[in-house]
Amino acid sequence: MKGIANSLIYLSYWPSAGSFGFNTNILETNIINITVVLGILIYFGKGVLSNLLDNRKSKIYSTIQNSEELCKGARHQLEKARARLQEIEMRVDEIRANGYLQIEQEKEDLVQAASVNLKQLEDSKNETVSFEQQKVIDQVRQQVSYQALQKALTFMKNCLNTELHLRMINYNIGRLRAKRTGQFL
């Protein structure tokens, strides 16, 4: 490579014969000179350009690999999230179903408790009514007994005199004697 570079340098120092040589003025150059310059640039710049392209290629390749790994990780996370979501949805449905069952059970329990309370209130009312009826009946009996006793005492005071009283005493004494002796009247 050094040999080619040296030969090109020597070509630039050759005395011009009038028609051949390197023109270093870019505006006065011709196609051959531009081709030669480009060829030299391509030949010597090929390694640098190749290295740059290889570096860029390896960076792109590693970026693609990283992206693919991240994509795989994201897919894996997405699958996990979907499975978790499905599990949570099943759990929510289960909780919802259990909630409805529990609500129905509590509703039935409340209806049952209300029915029991209503029956207890009805029984208590019936007992109270029965007790009050018995109390009224007892009060009426007491009043009737008291009034009958009052009438009997009044009758006794009015009807009984001493003579009737003595006769009654004698009669009862006679009965007691007869009992003692074994004779009954």
From Swiss-Prot:
This chain's source organism reads Gnetum parvifolium (Small-leaved jointfir)
Q: How does it assemble?
A: F-type ATPases have 2 components, F(1) - the catalytic core - and F(0) - the membrane proton channel. F(1) has five subunits: alpha(3), beta(3), gamma(1), delta(1), epsilon(1). F(0) has four main subunits: a(1), b(1), b'(1) and c(10-14). The alpha and beta chains form an alternating ring which encloses part of the gamma chain. F(1) is attached to F(0) by a central stalk formed by the gamma and epsilon chains, while a peripheral stalk is formed by the delta, b and b' chains.
The identity of this protein, by name, is ATP synthase subunit b, chloroplastic
Localization recorded for this chain is: Plastid, Chloroplast thylakoid membrane
Q: Which GO terms describe its molecular function?
A: proton-transporting ATP synthase activity, rotational mechanism
What's this chain's function?
F(1)F(0) ATP synthase produces ATP from ADP in the presence of a proton or sodium gradient. F-type ATPases consist of two structural domains, F(1) containing the extramembraneous catalytic core and F(0) containing the membrane proton channel, linked together by a central stalk and a peripheral stalk. During catalysis, ATP synthesis in the catalytic domain of F(1) is coupled via a rotary mechanism of the central stalk subunits to proton translocation. Component of the F(0) channel, it forms part of the peripheral stalk, linking F(1) to F(0).
What GO CC terms are in its UniProt record? chloroplast thylakoid membrane; proton-transporting ATP synthase complex
Membrane topology, record value: Single-pass membrane protein
Q: Which gene encodes it?
A: atpF
